[in-house]
Amino acid sequence: MADQNFCAAAIDATSRSTNTYIKFLSANDTGLTGGHQSGVLLSKKTCPMIFGELPDEHVAKRENIRITWQDDVKTDSTFTWYESKGELRLTRLGRGFPYLKPEETGALFVFSRLSEDEYSAYILVSEIEIEDYLTAFGLGPQDAGNMFSPSAGLAPELDEAAEIAA
Protein backbone atom coordinates (compact mmCIF):
# COMPACT_ATOMS: atom_id res chain seq x y z
CA MET A 1 0.00 0.00 0.00
CA ALA A 2 2.98 2.26 0.35
CA ASP A 3 3.20 2.55 -3.45
CA GLN A 4 -0.09 4.45 -3.72
CA ASN A 5 -0.36 8.16 -3.13
CA PHE A 6 -3.06 8.89 -0.60
CA CYS A 7 -1.95 12.45 0.02
CA ALA A 8 -4.57 14.11 -2.20
CA ALA A 9 -7.38 12.10 -0.60
CA ALA A 10 -6.10 12.94 2.90
CA ILE A 11 -5.93 16.63 1.99
CA ASP A 12 -9.48 16.49 0.64
CA ALA A 13 -10.84 14.73 3.74
CA THR A 14 -9.02 17.14 6.04
CA SER A 15 -10.32 20.17 4.16
CA ARG A 16 -13.89 18.86 4.65
CA SER A 17 -13.37 18.08 8.33
CA THR A 18 -14.29 19.99 11.44
CA ASN A 19 -11.09 18.87 13.19
CA THR A 20 -8.06 16.79 12.28
CA TYR A 21 -5.43 15.17 14.47
CA ILE A 22 -2.02 14.19 13.12
CA LYS A 23 0.83 12.20 14.62
CA PHE A 24 3.79 10.16 13.52
CA LEU A 25 3.19 6.49 14.29
CA SER A 26 5.48 5.19 17.02
CA ALA A 27 7.08 1.76 17.22
CA ASN A 28 4.50 0.88 19.90
CA ASP A 29 1.63 1.95 17.62
CA THR A 30 2.80 -0.34 14.80
CA GLY A 31 3.85 -3.32 16.91
CA LEU A 32 7.54 -2.95 16.06
CA THR A 33 8.52 -3.27 19.72
CA GLY A 34 6.51 -6.46 20.17
CA GLY A 35 4.82 -4.92 23.20
CA HIS A 36 1.31 -5.68 24.36
CA GLN A 37 -0.06 -2.25 23.41
CA SER A 38 -3.15 -2.42 21.26
CA GLY A 39 -4.10 0.32 18.81
CA VAL A 40 -2.90 3.88 18.38
CA LEU A 41 -2.08 6.10 21.33
CA LEU A 42 -3.57 9.57 20.86
CA SER A 43 -2.91 12.86 22.59
CA LYS A 44 -5.28 13.98 25.35
CA LYS A 45 -5.83 17.01 23.10
CA THR A 46 -8.11 14.88 20.91
CA CYS A 47 -10.58 14.12 23.72
CA PRO A 48 -12.89 17.06 22.85
CA MET A 49 -12.96 15.86 19.22
CA ILE A 50 -14.09 12.39 20.34
CA PHE A 51 -16.00 12.88 23.59
CA GLY A 52 -16.97 16.56 23.41
CA GLU A 53 -14.86 17.29 26.48
CA LEU A 54 -11.87 15.98 28.41
CA PRO A 55 -13.14 13.08 30.53
CA ASP A 56 -12.79 13.28 34.28
CA GLU A 57 -9.41 11.79 35.09
CA HIS A 58 -11.06 9.30 37.43
CA VAL A 59 -13.60 7.95 34.94
CA ALA A 60 -13.02 5.46 32.12
CA LYS A 61 -14.85 6.37 28.95
CA ARG A 62 -15.48 4.62 25.62
CA GLU A 63 -16.86 5.80 22.33
CA ASN A 64 -17.58 3.44 19.42
CA ILE A 65 -17.12 4.92 15.97
CA ARG A 66 -16.89 3.90 12.35
CA ILE A 67 -13.77 5.01 10.49
CA THR A 68 -13.27 4.97 6.73
CA TRP A 69 -9.59 4.44 5.95
CA GLN A 70 -7.72 4.72 2.67
CA ASP A 71 -8.71 2.09 0.10
CA ASP A 72 -12.25 2.39 1.56
CA VAL A 73 -11.40 0.02 4.42
CA LYS A 74 -13.98 0.50 7.20
CA THR A 75 -13.52 -0.32 10.87
CA ASP A 76 -15.94 -0.24 13.76
CA SER A 77 -13.41 0.98 16.29
CA THR A 78 -13.36 2.19 19.86
CA PHE A 79 -11.79 5.18 21.54
CA THR A 80 -10.99 4.35 25.12
CA TRP A 81 -9.95 6.84 27.78
CA TYR A 82 -7.88 5.00 30.40
CA GLU A 83 -8.29 7.11 33.51
CA SER A 84 -5.55 5.28 35.44
CA LYS A 85 -2.98 6.13 32.76
CA GLY A 86 -4.44 9.38 31.47
CA GLU A 87 -4.29 7.87 27.97
CA LEU A 88 -6.59 7.88 24.97
CA ARG A 89 -6.28 4.93 22.64
CA LEU A 90 -7.90 3.96 19.32
CA THR A 91 -8.56 0.20 19.38
CA ARG A 92 -10.69 -2.52 17.76
CA LEU A 93 -9.19 -2.12 14.33
CA GLY A 94 -9.79 -5.79 13.51
CA ARG A 95 -7.70 -8.82 12.69
CA GLY A 96 -5.53 -8.36 9.66
CA PHE A 97 -5.86 -4.57 9.76
CA PRO A 98 -3.56 -3.58 6.88
CA TYR A 99 -2.10 -0.28 8.08
CA LEU A 100 -0.44 -0.75 11.47
CA LYS A 101 2.58 -2.81 10.45
CA PRO A 102 6.13 -2.38 11.74
CA GLU A 103 7.21 -0.89 8.40
CA GLU A 104 4.67 1.93 8.94
CA THR A 105 6.63 3.24 11.96
CA GLY A 106 7.25 6.95 11.34
CA ALA A 107 4.33 7.29 8.91
CA LEU A 108 1.95 10.21 9.38
CA PHE A 109 -1.43 9.23 10.86
CA VAL A 110 -4.14 11.67 9.71
CA PHE A 111 -7.43 11.36 11.58
CA SER A 112 -10.34 13.64 10.66
CA ARG A 113 -13.83 14.15 11.99
CA LEU A 114 -16.04 14.84 8.99
CA SER A 115 -19.36 15.02 10.86
CA GLU A 116 -20.80 13.95 14.20
CA ASP A 117 -20.60 10.27 13.31
CA GLU A 118 -18.26 10.18 10.31
CA TYR A 119 -14.47 9.88 10.58
CA SER A 120 -11.67 9.26 8.10
CA ALA A 121 -8.10 8.13 8.58
CA TYR A 122 -5.04 7.93 6.37
CA ILE A 123 -1.53 6.61 6.87
CA LEU A 124 0.92 8.62 4.75
CA VAL A 125 4.16 6.70 4.34
CA SER A 126 6.46 8.46 1.89
CA GLU A 127 8.38 11.59 2.81
CA ILE A 128 6.91 13.35 -0.23
CA GLU A 129 3.32 12.56 0.81
CA ILE A 130 4.01 13.69 4.37
CA GLU A 131 5.68 16.92 3.27
CA ASP A 132 2.94 17.71 0.74
CA TYR A 133 0.20 17.07 3.31
CA LEU A 134 1.80 19.21 6.00
CA THR A 135 2.56 22.01 3.53
CA ALA A 136 -1.06 22.04 2.34
CA PHE A 137 -2.13 23.21 5.79
CA GLY A 138 0.88 25.36 6.66
CA LEU A 139 2.13 22.75 9.13
CA GLY A 140 5.50 21.19 9.81
CA PRO A 141 6.74 18.02 11.51
CA GLN A 142 6.79 19.90 14.82
CA ASP A 143 2.97 20.17 14.63
CA ALA A 144 2.46 16.40 14.84
CA GLY A 145 0.66 15.31 17.98
CA ASN A 146 -1.77 18.20 17.66
CA MET A 147 -5.32 18.72 16.49
CA PHE A 148 -6.17 21.53 14.10
CA SER A 149 -9.11 23.02 12.25
CA PRO A 150 -8.53 23.28 8.51
CA SER A 151 -10.87 26.26 8.09
CA ALA A 152 -7.94 28.39 6.91
CA GLY A 153 -8.04 26.42 3.65
CA LEU A 154 -5.43 24.80 1.47
CA ALA A 155 -2.24 26.38 0.24
CA PRO A 156 -3.01 27.56 -3.34
CA GLU A 157 -0.24 25.55 -5.05
CA LEU A 158 -1.45 22.28 -3.48
CA ASP A 159 -5.14 23.03 -3.92
CA GLU A 160 -4.78 22.56 -7.69
CA ALA A 161 -2.74 19.38 -7.23
CA ALA A 162 -5.40 17.93 -4.92
CA GLU A 163 -8.17 18.67 -7.45
CA ILE A 164 -6.21 17.08 -10.31
CA ALA A 165 -5.39 13.96 -8.28
CA ALA A 166 -8.95 13.51 -6.95
Residue spans of the language-model regions?
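Intrinsically disordered, charged low-complexity linkers and terminal tails
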Residues: M1-A166
